[in-house]
């Protein structure tokens, strides 16, 4: 199904171990995971209420039994692996992992991720526009087979 994100989604769970979390209902002032939709995936965080054990990942919500399957762990207090939670109440909420974010500057422009130092282009389509190029481009290669043109030549 679809990856769905919603704001202010938070429930509690008493999950023990590394399995699927049974969700116990929305915290006061928050929405339930049901807003994600049955069978859809979402980014989640599960954290014990002391904050020592936590996990961020991609989970699948199921309305039958109101569960969240911990499908893919993106980061955790267990070195990026599933956390084996111990007894007690945990918070489960929708989050947006920093590694999935698009970084914007203060003007709202995407921050460049750098330019490759060198690369080999293969199977490139289109005609790059370059200044200072002379000669003709044959018609078979998308050109007009002329070195200059006047109004009406094209």
Stretches found by the model and what they are:
Residues 2-7, 14-154:
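Extracellular repetitive beta-rich solenoid segments
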